[in-house]
Amino acid sequence: MSKAQFSTKERILDAAETLFAQYGFGGTSLRQVTSQADVNIAAVNYHFGSKENLVNEVFRR
């Protein structure tokens, strides 16, 4: 994985962790995650495939 990919994935995970902690899974949209991580939805889909996979990765950290 390149440094840019690692950075993007980490930014998404950091944003998701913060938002899930603050608003819960149901109260957090992927749009909020992408906005906070400064990425587009395609990056989330590329790295995680779904919101469920994203939250699972947050828990694995």
Predicted regions: what is each one?
Residues 39-48:
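Short hydrophobic/aromatic patch on the recognition helix
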Residues 1-23, 28-38, 52-56:
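Basic, helix-initiating cap at the start of DNA-binding domains
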Residues 60-61:
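Short, basic, alpha-helical segments at the C-terminal edge of helix-turn-helix-like DNA-binding modules
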